[in-house]
Amino acid sequence: MKCLLLALALTCGAQALIVTQTMKGLDIQKVAGTWYSLAMAASDISLLDAQSAPLRVYVEELKPTPEGDLEILLQKWENGECAQKKIIAEKTKIPAVFKIDALNENKVLVLDTDYKKYLLFCMENSAEPEQSLACQCLVRTPEVDDEALEKFDKALKALPMHIRLSFNPTQLEEQCHI
């Protein structure tokens, strides 16, 4: 019986996609500005596999609001063309965690940033039964940043990712833009 309970606990624990490590002391004002999506990863292949996949979004700009929320401007392929979206990520008691109601996700979590070159974040849907997790590595310039990619890969090691995409400088410039 103890073995059965242990197996059940381990199975249930493995199903949780909750990100536990977020950045401490995030200064929301310093993330403002233009960003490029350098790499993406997701817990479910269908979230990123096609150009119009639900979480294959290209972050364009982050804008802190006077209330401490975060406005996220992004581009996404819809109906064969590039569409601009605006998401308001509402602040929570934890500086690096924001609440959203968009793209079927319910949280944005900032994992790490140096503010000048890169920002790592994840979008999480912890609701049953469609738990999902998608993360991105953003950079300030349309150039490949090996250090940022290294940090992204390190952050992903503890997460259940099943697909990962990276973009070269030409692809960064050609990302869905209006």
From Swiss-Prot:
GO MF annotation, one: identical protein binding
Residues in coiled coil: none
Cited InterPro entries: Blactoglobulin (IPR002447), Calycin (IPR012674), Lipocalin (IPR002345), Lipocalin_CS (IPR022272), Lipocln_cytosolic_FA-bd_dom (IPR000566)
Keyword vocabulary terms for this entry: Allergen, Disulfide bond, Milk protein, Retinol-binding, Secreted, Signal, Transport
One Gene Ontology cellular component annotation held by this UniProt entry: extracellular region
Signal peptide start and end residues: 1-16
Pfam families: Lipocalin
UniProt PTM comment: Alternate disulfide bonds occur in equal amounts in all variants examined.
Keyword Isomerase found: no
Task of the protein: Primary component of whey, it binds retinol and is probably involved in the transport of that molecule.
PANTHER family per UniProt: GLYCODELIN, LIPOCALIN
Listed name of the protein: Beta-lactoglobulin
Taxonomy of the source species: Eukaryota, Metazoa, Chordata, Craniata, Vertebrata
